[in-house]
C-alpha cells in the first residue's frame, strides 16, 4: 500500500534548515527560517521565560490534562494583549479563546471550524504570503485565492491594487490579514489604510481572519495591534490566530491561540462549542508548559516588565541590523539602492533578490535564504554582516 506513495516536495522554509544543517562550511549563514538570533547568532531563552519556568517548577502541582480550550488565564491574557485591557469587546464577553499548538494550529482549527460550521468556501490571502497559509486552508477543504499586495518596483504596499483585487471577494468570503510585520515583505498598511480596509470589509460582508505572529516586533505591543483593533471596533465577527513563538522566543513549545469574536456572548459561546469540537477531533487538548509560561509572565507585573524590555531589545536589535545591512551593502559597492529595507517591519526583509541569485548565494557562499528572496534580518550579526554583504554584491 505504501510503496506507491511519491515523496512530498521539501518544505520551502523548513527544508532549507535541513540543507543548512548538512552544510559543513564553517562560515555558512542561515537567513531562512524565522527565528530571532542575538548578536552571537544564538536563539536565546529569555530571562523572563527562565524565571517563569523556575516558578512553575517549584509551584506546579499536577500534570493532569487541560480542558479542550486550554488554560483560562492564558485566554484572558491573550485577549487583553490583542484587544487592549478594558476593551468593550472583552467586557461584553464577545470573545472566546482556545489555546492551540502554535499559530499554525490556530489557523488549522479556524479553517476546520469554518469549513464544517459555516458556508465559507474561499479564503483570500495576500500575494506574497507565508507559503504554509495555502497548505493549511487547502487541507481543510477551502479554496485559496490571492489578492495583490506588493509593489516590487517601488518596494511598497500597492494599496490600490490590493483594493482592486479584493473587489472580487464576495460576501461570506474570508480575507486573511497579517496583524503586523507582514511575512515575507515586512510592509504593513498605515493606520489610515487599516481603517479603509476595516470599513470596506464590513461593507462587503467579508469575515476577517488575522494571522498575528509578531506582536511587538514592528513598533510595540499596543501600536502593532492598531490594525486588528480598527477591525474589532467595526466588525461583529472575526477570528484571530496568534502566536507566542516569536515574542516570547517559545518556538519549540508551540504556543498559539485561536480567538473567536461574535456579535454577543450567547452567539460566541455556541460557536465556540463547535470550535472545541474541532479541537477534540484533532489533538484533544493542548500541552500546558508553554502556555503556563506565557500566562505566568503576563499576569505578573515584575516578570511582564522584564519581558517587555526583552521584547524591546529584540525589536531594536533587528532595526540596528537593518540599518547596518543597508550601510554595509553600500560600502561593499552594491549597484542598487537597498534603503527600502530600513522601512520594513519585523524579522523579514523582502530583498528583491531573484531565485537564481538566492541559489548562487547558497551554492557559492553558504548563505541560505528563501527562494522568494525573503531574508531573516534577525539572523544577521555584526560578525557575519561583511561576508554576507560581499556575497550579495557578488551575485547582483
UniProtKB/Swiss-Prot annotation:
<dbReference type="GO" id="GO:0004069">
    <property type="term" value="F:L-aspartate:2-oxoglutarate aminotransferase activity"/>
</dbReference>
<feature type="modified residue" description="N6-(pyridoxal phosphate)lysine">
    <location>
        <position position="246"/>
    </location>
</feature>
<feature type="binding site">
    <location>
        <position position="130"/>
    </location>
    <ligand>
        <name>L-aspartate</name>
    </ligand>
</feature>
<comment type="similarity">
    <text>Belongs to the class-I pyridoxal-phosphate-dependent aminotransferase family.</text>
</comment>
<dbReference type="InterPro" id="IPR004839">
    <property type="entry name" value="Aminotransferase_I/II_large"/>
</dbReference>
<keyword id="KW-0808">Transferase</keyword>
<feature type="binding site">
    <location>
        <position position="183"/>
    </location>
    <ligand>
        <name>L-aspartate</name>
    </ligand>
</feature>
<comment type="subunit">
    <text>Homodimer.</text>
</comment>
<dbReference type="InterPro" id="IPR004838">
    <property type="entry name" value="NHTrfase_class1_PyrdxlP-BS"/>
</dbReference>
<protein>
    <recommendedName>
        <fullName>Aspartate aminotransferase</fullName>
        <ecNumber>2.6.1.1</ecNumber>
    </recommendedName>
</protein>
<keyword id="KW-0963">Cytoplasm</keyword>
<dbReference type="InterPro" id="IPR015424">
    <property type="entry name" value="PyrdxlP-dep_Trfase"/>
</dbReference>
<feature type="binding site">
    <location>
        <position position="374"/>
    </location>
    <ligand>
        <name>L-aspartate</name>
    </ligand>
</feature>
<dbReference type="InterPro" id="IPR015421">
    <property type="entry name" value="PyrdxlP-dep_Trfase_major"/>
</dbReference>
<dbReference type="GO" id="GO:0042802">
    <property type="term" value="F:identical protein binding"/>
</dbReference>
<keyword id="KW-0663">Pyridoxal phosphate</keyword>
<dbReference type="Pfam" id="PF00155">
    <property type="entry name" value="Aminotran_1_2"/>
</dbReference>
<dbReference type="InterPro" id="IPR000796">
    <property type="entry name" value="Asp_trans"/>
</dbReference>
<keyword id="KW-0032">Aminotransferase</keyword>
<dbReference type="GO" id="GO:0033585">
    <property type="term" value="P:L-phenylalanine biosynthetic process from chorismate via phenylpyruvate"/>
</dbReference>
<feature type="binding site">
    <location>
        <position position="34"/>
    </location>
    <ligand>
        <name>L-aspartate</name>
    </ligand>
</feature>
<dbReference type="GO" id="GO:0005829">
    <property type="term" value="C:cytosol"/>
</dbReference>
<dbReference type="GO" id="GO:0030170">
    <property type="term" value="F:pyridoxal phosphate binding"/>
</dbReference>
<dbReference type="InterPro" id="IPR015422">
    <property type="entry name" value="PyrdxlP-dep_Trfase_small"/>
</dbReference>
<dbReference type="GO" id="GO:0004838">
    <property type="term" value="F:L-tyrosine-2-oxoglutarate transaminase activity"/>
</dbReference>
